[in-house]
């Protein structure tokens, strides 16, 4: 593997000194870029794009050709794991992901097999190794997975949901059944993420997109417990370096202290959290990633500049901050505004690292 030329992102996650705040964007390879749309059209559909290692590599690299980013993130989808379990993932126009065979009974959960990451998910591993090779050491590669709770919401509901009625009903009426599913998913995610590291991922992120839908006690029981299990089971060193782990619960501002106790290296923050307050609460234990509202990118470059300065100022001096959006970039954002955001972070952050 090529020697890493820019390790700013990895150093910030490990709270080591950096010259400026590193920056990347969730969904930085995505529909806001015309070149992404062209490659997706070439692939035919979303999952065909994910399953073609060369095209997945191409879209991963596209934002790095445009912007001065400090990390690349594997182009894939959190639902690759349940798809590999045989649920029959497909996408309905305007409705998002759906499963042909939801896992909403104890019998269906018992039948689930833990997928072999080098077999059923081999296309992801081939993409990881291809991307790592093609990056040529320019920036680190982030691997990722959905959290067990978030994956389970799609599996039990049969797709996207606004109310999570089916899975919450299961949580309160048949908690042992849900725990069986979450335990299988945690085991699957551990294997999946460790295989990503073995194939070249240099940092890992767990997306708990729907943890914020849970009550205080339910979050600990059904989400955090299984992210803890994953953190405990992950490969944390590869290529002579530590492999940092970031946990991100959207809507998880109430639970930062509990998340920081898991032994992860960093926490992702959504835009509802004040990053300065978060640093006071948990900054002695973990680095922080975030957390500009993605909608700010609809504003003028001048306003984007102001918002970046406000977040940098709130975090304050020193390392331990990876700048990002508070969630994925919106598909209708002007790509030039994304560039203004990234340039603003690099231009403004140097004074906080002297």
Curated annotation (Swiss-Prot):
GO terms for cellular component: cytosol. It catalyses: uroporphyrinogen III + 4 H(+) = coproporphyrinogen III + 4 CO2. Substrate binds at residues 27-31, 77, 154, 209, 327. Its EC number is 4.1.1.37. The keyword Lyase applies. InterPro entries: UROD/MetE-like_sf, Uroporphyrinogen_deCO2ase_HemE, Uroporphyrinogen_deCOase. One of its GO terms (biological process) is protoporphyrinogen IX biosynthetic process from glutamate. Keywords: Cytoplasm, Decarboxylase, Lyase, Porphyrin biosynthesis. The record marks 77 as: Transition state stabilizer. The keyword Cytoplasm applies. One of its GO terms (molecular function) is uroporphyrinogen decarboxylase activity. Pathway: Porphyrin-containing compound metabolism; protoporphyrin-IX biosynthesis; coproporphyrinogen-III from 5-aminolevulinate: step 4/4. It is found in: Cytoplasm. PROSITE patterns: UROD_1, UROD_2. It holds the Pfam family URO-D. PANTHER family: METHYLTETRAHYDROFOLATE:HOMOCYSTEINE METHYLTRANSFERASE RELATED (PTHR21091), UROPORPHYRINOGEN DECARBOXYLASE (PTHR21091:SF169). Catalyzes the decarboxylation of four acetate groups of uroporphyrinogen-III to yield coproporphyrinogen-III. Belongs to the uroporphyrinogen decarboxylase family. Homodimer. This is Uroporphyrinogen decarboxylase. It comes from Shewanella piezotolerans (strain WP3 / JCM 13877). The gene is hemE.
